[in-house]
């Protein structure tokens, strides 16, 4: 069993709404005043399309973790010269594995006409930390060159 050279296409609904109408897709441009929200992180039924070169694609029902989680940056309550950061992502909590057989009509020998591939799906979904952020990897806007472009440019006092 192998997932080598196997491609996985996920067909899923993105659980977001614009003015109470469901929308799908990854990118939405919104006019000012538009109400936009996405559902919390949850396990969602999807269709996985398993593909392997020389084999017929096979659509299988599965699950994916889809939804929003809270992330923020704010001034520290105890040390106002520091920022507190938290980044949470909708991720799996445990996984299940399944073996699927793909039909490969162009295979040279009879043995390889049916290829076993492994696929995985989440058992549960939850908001979990995305990963740690090293303080040294965060570049202040002034260093990155964005400070004069932002809406807060004149809000903060410049230090000499």
From Swiss-Prot:
Domain CTCK: 38-131
TM ranges: none
InterPro entries per the UniProt record, alphabetical: Cys_knot_C, Cystine-knot_cytokine, DAN
Cellular component terms (Gene Ontology): extracellular space
A family per Pfam: DAN
The keyword ATP-binding appears for this protein: no
Cystine pairs: 41-90, 55-104, 65-125, 69-127, 87-130
Entry function: Final heterodimeric neurohormone released at the end of the molting cycle, involved in the sclerotization (tanning) of the insect cuticle, melanization and wing spreading.
Subunit structure: Heterodimer of burs and pburs.
Protein name as catalogued: Bursicon
Gene: burs
């Amino acid at each position: 069993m192998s997932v080598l050279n196997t491609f996985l296409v996920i067909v899923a609904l993105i659980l977001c709404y614009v003015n109470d109408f469901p929308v799908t897709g990854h990118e939405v441009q919104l006019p000012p005043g538009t109400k936009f929200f996405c559902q919390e992180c949850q396990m969602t039924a999807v269709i996985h399309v398993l593909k392997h070169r020389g084999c017929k694609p096979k659509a299988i029902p599965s699950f994916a973790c889809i939804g929003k989680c809270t992330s923020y940056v704010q001034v520290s309550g105890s040390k106002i010269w520091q920022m507190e950061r938290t980044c949470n992502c909708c991720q799996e909590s445990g996984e299940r594995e399944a073996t699927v057989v793909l039909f490969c009509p162009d295979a040279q020998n009879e043995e390889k006409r049916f290829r076993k591939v492994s696929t995985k799906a989440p058992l549960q979904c939850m908001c979990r930390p995305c990963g740690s952020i090293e303080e040294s990897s965060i570049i202040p806007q002034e260093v990155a060159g964005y400070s004069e472009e932002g809406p807060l440019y004149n809000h903060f006092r410049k230090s000499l």
